[in-house]
Amino acid sequence: MNYEKWRHPPVSLVESVKASRAVYKRLGNSGLVVSNPILGGMHIGNPKWNDWVLDEKESIALLKAAYERGVNTWDTANMYSNGESEKIMGKALRVHNIPRSKVVIMTKCCRAVTDPNIEPDIGISTAFYPELSGQSKDYVNHFGLSRASIFQQVEASLQRLNTDYIDVLQIHRFDPEVPPEETMKALHDLVQMNKVRYLGASSMWAHEFAILQHAAEKNNWTKFVSMQNHYSLLYREEEREMIKYCNLTGVGVISWGSLASGRLARPPDQRTVSPRGVNGTIYKDYNPTQSEEIIRRVHQTAVSRGIPMSQVALAWLNKRIVAPVIGLSSVERIDEALDAKAVELSHEEERYLESAYRAQSIQGHA
């Protein structure tokens, strides 16, 4: 047996490592490895849904660029562009011949997806009107976290993604109308059916998340391995309880709103031309004076280091979570986010960035 040829790694493996610019981390106590950063799919879809969304051609090219650089974890939701985000991710895999097993797809269920059979305008979002949807013959059992609605939503997502399984199925929010046991048993059954590999959750109160985890644990069902929180230098309320709970119980934390819709990526006095920046963030800033001061400090730190502001904000996050979900809208933004892995803030810099923050109203749980 000739062992000499095995003394050095294959050239193909070395080249693959060089091309893989992302950092890879385990998602909580699970065995699943995800990339840091995670590509956010809210930007992927149809501009009719929102004017800052990339169209199909732009999205497919962006997904290819992300994959080639090692960003192999893509986060989306059934409601994003009313399902178009999921469709485009599935199409990108086919168009670029990307093996399904080489990409981690995270999607979400709970919100209503507008039915094209009764509303052909893809720009209309039913997701934000749950009370009205619950009174509609066309939407009952098509949103929320009942067994019936979860199964319906997952089957629809699988078809749009053109895949046999979802790597991480996340519940988009807590559903107080459904018994925790019903929700968790339905999710567990999907894992047993191999339609879902892992379970995750997104923004809710810590006690709600604990109730769901307890329901799964006491019945020996599949538990959540991740929590996707609203979290950034401008919004740190999840540090009160949720992040502590996740760290104590081995749940991997990932963040949405990581750069606060780009506010943490540009100086406070710089006007933005991007539609999302012009039209404002999803949630209201209840303390703009505080936010402007934090943004000023991020800018000052970035200038002193000679790096983009986004890398300062992401370096702060990367030390505290598994990975940030980022709406990467261009190849330049992908490269910028990937280079944040080389930035390590000092204790003094962290204190400087954090000290202007004061507690604020909870946002993003509904």
From Swiss-Prot:
Report the pathway entry: Mycotoxin biosynthesis
Please give the superkingdom of this protein's source: Eukaryota
Residues recorded as binding NADP(+), renumbered to this chain, are 75, 202-203, 228, 257-267, 329-337
GO MF, any single term: oxidoreductase activity
Pfam family membership, one: Aldo_ket_red
Q: Which residues bind substrate?
A: H172
Family, according to the entry, reads as follows:
Belongs to the aldo/keto reductase family.
Report what the protein is called: Aldo-keto reductase AFTS1
Organism this protein belongs to: Alternaria alternata
**Which taxonomic lineage does the organism of this UniProt entry have?**
Eukaryota, Fungi, Dikarya, Ascomycota, Pezizomycotina
